[in-house]
A protein has these predicted regions:
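An N-terminally biased module of ancient metal coordination in phosphate/nucleic-acid-related enzymes
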Residues: 1-80
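Active-site neighborhood of phospho(di)ester-bond hydrolases with catalytic His/Asp-centered motifs
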Residues: 10-12, 46-48, 86, 142-144, ...
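Short, basic, glycine/proline-bearing loop/turn elements
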Residues: 16-20, 114-115, 170-175
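Proline-centered helix-kink/hinge sites
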Residues: 18, 49, 146, 180-182
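Short histidine/acidic/glycine/proline-rich micro-motifs that form metal-
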Residues: 21, 51-53, 118-120, 147-150, ...
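A broad, structure-centric signal for solvent-exposed, well-ordered loop/edge residues
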Residues: 23, 92, 121, 185-186
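Extended substrate/RNA-proximal surfaces in nucleic-acid metabolism proteins
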Residues: 58-169
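Single conserved hydrophobic/aromatic residue that forms the stacking wall/gate
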Residues: 177-187
């Protein structure tokens, strides 16, 4: 990562921006979520709303994300954790129709939180898309909630391969305390 985003406790995957995806429905809910994260010691929060390139253009997504972030930042009380913008990007062929993918990176870094289909295996094609992000766009993929990908959990060599390419694996904290449930593998 290109800065000190990981210094201190950082929440790198949350749906906290109001009204943009399946996370917080409004600013009040977002502020409650931030208060809980702050009480747990979070110093930085990376807002990662879902971006599906087959459903919305990158420009329209960024406009929605930035508007939601502006609302949230205007309501933040003093002493709140630092807010950074990012996205949870569903990787598909449509993503690469954008010439410039730098806006999907976590603010201040070369990393992007990447989501893959839960029902598909990490095929050679999927690996090649990750390689394209790394080699052609200078983006370090952070593979979101890897515990939900049965194909990676069943084939640790595949995960090792992705990490050897330069990918970073992100897990939800519940994995540290419980075994993945069938819901984690849901399509």
């Amino acid at each position: 990562m290109t800065d000190t985003i990981l210094n201190g406790l950082t929440e790198t995957h949350c749906h906290i921006l109001p009204g943009i995806d399946d996370g917080s429905k409004d600013v009040e809910t977002s502020l409650k979520m931030i208060a809980k994260l702050s009480a747990q010691g979070a110093e930085k929060i990376v807002c990662t709303p879902h971006y599906y390139s087959d459903s919305i253009s990158l420009a329209d997504f960024l406009q929605k994300r930035d508007a939601a972030a502006a609302k949230l930042k205007a309501a933040l009380p003093p002493g709140s954790p630092e807010i950074r913008l990012g996205a949870e990007v569903y990787i598909s062929k449509y993503l690469f129709s954008n010439d410039d993918l730098s806006p999907i990176k976590i603010e201040g870094t070369n990393c992007a939180l990447i989501e893959h289909s839960f029902s598909e295996e990490f095929s050679d094609r999927a690996c090649n898309r990750l390689i394209d992000l790394i080699c052609d766009h200078g983006i370090t993929p952070i593979l979101a909630h890897i515990e939900r990908y049965k194909s990676l959990m069943d084939k640790p060599d595949k995960l090792d391969y992705l990490i050897s390419l330069g990918c970073i694996a992100q897990v939800n904290i519940c994995l540290l305390y419980t075994s993945p449930s069938p819901r984690d593998y849901a399509a």
